[in-house]
Amino acid sequence: MYKTYHEIELKFLIDNPRLVHMILKKHKAKFIGKVFEKTLRFDTPNNELEQMGKFLRIRTGFKNVITFKHKIKNRNFKEREEIELEIEDPIKMRQILENLGFTKVLIMEKYREKWWLNNTEIDIDKLPMGSFVEIEGKPREIRQVAKLLQLDFIKRITDNYWDLWAIFTRRNGIKSKNIVFNAVKDIKK
């Protein structure tokens, strides 16, 4: 069974994940779990999906899913139409996609903590380029939770992690198009 979903979210770069944890616990947010996620992003050799604002991925972590996303224009929030299907075997699904011509594959690694508070999903993500809070829900609730977490709405990020990675790699002279921890091991902090 698949689900179609209208996704609205924002992310914020954070320096102090501990502070976010403390605030979430103080407000009795429900902790769902922590996991290492690996995402394989697929496209044609000519990047046809990316050019159309579309995104196809397989993600392993809390569960194994294949997801198709399509951008919706929104200046204040990251908004997408999403179709997601839980899959049993990510390796076989990858083989199917590659045989259909989706041979360009990019990899993203991240550690994700999932929380629920005030009808929003709050993810604390650790990626090679930093830590982020991602808040998903309805716009009003996203704003309320961002304020509760002491996140400045003006500093919200609507770019996806791939766009942020492209900026980060240019600034730091990294050649990898894959968002992997091994790519940043030599960067001096």
Describe the predicted segments one by one.
Residues L19-V20, E141-R143:
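Short acidic, Gly/Pro-enriched loop/turn segments at secondary-structure junctions
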Residues M1-E121, K155-K189:
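N-terminal strand-loop-strand beta-hairpin
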Residues I142-I154:
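Acidic (Asp/Glu-rich), glycine- and aromatic
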Residues I124-M129:
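A contiguous pocket-lining binding segment that forms or flanks enzyme active sites
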